[in-house]
Amino acid sequence: MASPQHPGGPGWTGPRNQCITRTRQEVLPPGPDLPCPGPEEAQDGPTSNSNMTTRELQEHWQKEKSRWKHVRLLFEIASARIEERKVSKFVMYQVVVIQTGSFDSDKAVVERRYSDFERLQRALLKRFGPELEDVTFPRKRLTGNLSAETICERRLELREYLRLLYAVRAVRRSREFADFLTRPELCEAFGCLRAGQYARALDLLGRVVPLQEKLTAHCPSAPVPALCAMLVCLRDLERPAEAFAVGERALRRLGARESHRYYAPLLDAMVRLAYALGKDLASLQGRLDESQLRRPTHRGATLKELTVREYLS
């Protein structure tokens, strides 16, 4: 039986009541550039005063090179189909995204209309105009858009368009590019979460999160809201062990970023899950206590309260 002194007990007033609230500036979502450190910004190498031998230095930099190995993605327009609505017909293109360099078991597949590509192009031109001078966007046709010949040609043109975009560093790291490939699915998933459709939300998140992780490899914390949404779904579906495993993934991505709006609520949820699973919660509780000592505030939002606010528009 849970006691008032333990997480889950009826009288427990631990981490949740002390969860961190954020100032308006802190809770704003990250900017469109997802400005997180990449290999060129890494500062954790050996100093000039290091006593490491030449061999040790070589081994260290080999590990660093492996750690920051650039994720390369390939884009393929695998197929196309004609979607019929009451008053219109249009083509849906199946975009397949594959990570190179190793076997990719999480091949991502999404569907987008030509108009979706058009919106992406307009948004990118607005931000990166001069950098896109070598990128050709497939022109719009007034007639024949549903012919087999046009669809085949456009599949090849859109594949080349994505390849050229991805070759531009600023574009592939932009929020616009990541949103183009993930936002519709994330919006649907979070909508299902708000509606209490946890199984459907979990299915959608399970397919889109691996793609989001690949697209935002330069910014490890970017997928944290989606990972936390998966935790909430699994927890409410009474699958605590899986929820805890997903929470560990989210914590690894946050690292020591105590100022992140998800840091304390996630730790609070993990403490409760650890207690329910009979796991050692001392380390998690210690991290949460230290965070609250350094940033003493009143009660903040729970993890579920945070996740249901994401992707509202």
UniProtKB/Swiss-Prot annotation:
GO MF entries: phosphatidylinositol phosphate binding; phosphatidylinositol-3-phosphate binding; phosphatidylinositol-4,5-bisphosphate binding
A biological-process GO annotation: protein transport
Stored PROSITE patterns: PX
Chain positions with Phosphoserine modification: S3
Pfam family, one: PX
Membrane topology category: Peripheral membrane protein
Nucleotide-binding recorded as keyword: no
Main location: membrane
Record-linked SUPFAM superfamilies: PX domain
Statement: the UniProt record of this protein carries the keyword Phosphoprotein: yes
Gene3D superfamilies: Phox-like domain
Cellular component terms per the entry's GO annotation: early endosome membrane; nucleoplasm; plasma membrane
Bias type Polar residues, positions: 45-55
Compositional bias segments (type: Pro residues): 29-38
Keywords, comma-separated and alphabetical: Cell membrane, Cytoplasm, Endosome, Lipid-binding, Membrane, Nucleus, Phosphoprotein, Protein transport, Transport
Free-text domain note: The PX domain binds phosphatidylinositol 3-phosphate which is necessary for localization to the endosomes.
Self-association state and partner proteins as the record states: Interacts with SELPLG. Interaction with SELPLG is controversial.
Record-given protein name: Sorting nexin-20
Species name: Rattus norvegicus
Biological classification of the source: Eukaryota, Metazoa, Chordata, Craniata, Vertebrata
Gene encoding the protein: Snx20
